[in-house]
Design a protein with these regions (language model features):
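Surface-exposed, low-hydrophobicity segments enriched in Gly/Pro/acidic/Ser residues
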Residues: 1-404
Length: 404
């Protein structure tokens, strides 16, 4: 007891009356406990007396109750092909997301609407097929989906962060040129707007060609965005050229990123800003779907924010081995090895060599009734110690489960 207030104190004495207490983090000056020691196996919390009736901590010995929720989504689909060269389809979705079935407060924003329309028109059909396409999506701010609407990289593609709010409008349009059995070239213009605080556009150019013994792949994009507090430009490209002859191949690869985000008020780069470029060569022999071996060499330059300027931090050289040594109906053996030397621009830092490898062996017995997998890994270099905190969310909304 502290001034007639019952408090909990950490103790490991077996003679004391012990309680299993769980603490939850609350807002600053809303709790009476602070986190005193997080290095121990069990976190230690300390009671701090209020000052003039104002709590001085940000933890409380309470467990938040999770209210039952309900999410419903109804969709209506349609399709119309006025001619052989024209295709139109649409989708309308309505959602009802009640975050607390025990309460009627704030029920006015439970319902939301989303629409999507696609159109494609064949412009030219001879040696080359040329198609124009457009896709428009509108998602009201209160619309809730059961599953993820976009890829996990969507936010990074647009430098959205966690600030995008309001109704969403997303337009995709472009041209696709296809050379039958040879390849295709696609140009896209994308426009994304959030009514609250974001507007951006992206230019995308993708190519894939198989010409005689040559295989060419390229993916490139350029983003220009304007948010409430920042602007950004984001350039990316990944290109690979490979030449096949008999059971052998040689190739080269280029990857680069240049992401520059600036604060509107200070005109300074944000911590998101970074840049890298990587190029290399590789050669292999065999069948990449069966037994093969491939050797590669790659050189990379990394630039990051230093003293308010994006500048060179380190360079690296990587020697890589990819292989599948055994491939049968009953077993397969794969081996991957990477040796990297990291060279820092800062002369006070030593070069960091690292060797990482993985060998995977799969075997199947009794007509695949029994299957076994053996994995052997080696790692060198240092990995910083990390601590993770997990918060319980309603069933179906998390990606981790409690297992003890």
């Amino acid at each position: 007891m502290v001034n007639t207030v019952e408090v909990f104190e950490y103790s490991n004495k077996p003679d004391d009356v012990l309680f299993n207490v769980r603490f939850s983090q609350v807002a600053v000056n809303k709790g009476n406990y602070i986190l005193k020691n997080s290095a121990a196996i069990s976190r230690i919390y300390e009671y701090i007396e209020p000052v003039n009736g104002i709590p001085q901590g940000n933890y409380e010995p309470v467990i938040q109750l999770i209210a039952p929720i309900k999410t419903q989504v109804a969709t209506f689909l349609g399709k119309y092909n006025p001619t052989e060269k024209t295709a139109i389809d649409f989708e309308i979705g309505v959602s009802n997301n009640d975050k607390n079935l025990f309460s009627s407060q704030d029920d006015s924003n439970n319902e939301g609407l989303a629409t999507k329309i696609n159109a494609k028109q064949r412009l030219f059909s001879k040696k080359w097929n040329v198609d124009a396409f457009a896709n428009y999506q509108f998602i009201a701010k209160d619309f809730s989906s059961v599953e993820r609407l976009y890829s996990i990289e969507f936010s990074r593609d647009w430098n959205l962060g966690t600030t995008a709010i309001g109704n969403q409008s997303y337009l995709v349009s472009g041209l696709q040129m296809t050379l039958p059995e040879k390849g295709s070239l696609v140009y896209q213009f994308e426009k994304l707007d959030f009514s609250g605080n974001f507007s951006g556009n992206r230019h995308i150019l993708n190519a894939l060609f198989n010409l005689n013994h040559w295989k060419i792949q390229s993916q490139g994009s350029f983003l220009n965005s304007d948010a409430t507090s920042s602007t950004s430009k984001f350039l990316r490209n990944q290109t690979q050229v490979k030449y096949h002859f008999k059971k052998n191949w040689i190739g080269t690869r280029l990857r680069l990123e240049d992401n520059q985000e600036k604060n509107k008020t200070t005109n300074e780069f944000s911590a998101l800003s970074q840049r890298f470029s990587e190029y290399g060569f590789f050669a292999g022999r065999g069948d990449s779907t069966k037994v093969f071996v491939e050797l590669g060499y790659f050189k990379r330059a990394n630039d990051s924010l230093q003293n308010g300027i994006i500048q060179r931090v380190n360079n690296s050289q990587t020697f890589a081995l990819r292989s599948k040594l055994i491939q049968t109906n009953k077993s397969d053996l794969s081996l991957f090895v990477n040796y990297r030397v990291l060279d820092f621009v800062d002369a006070t830092k030593k070069n960091e060599p690292s060797l990482n490898s993985r060998m995977i062996y799969n075997d199947r017995f009794f007509n695949q009734l029994i299957q076994s997998t053996t994995v052997f890994e080696t790692n060198s270099g240092s990995i910083p110690q990390q601590e993770f905190t997990y918060l319980e969310v309603p069933v179906g909304q998390g990606v981790y489960t409690w297992n003890d």
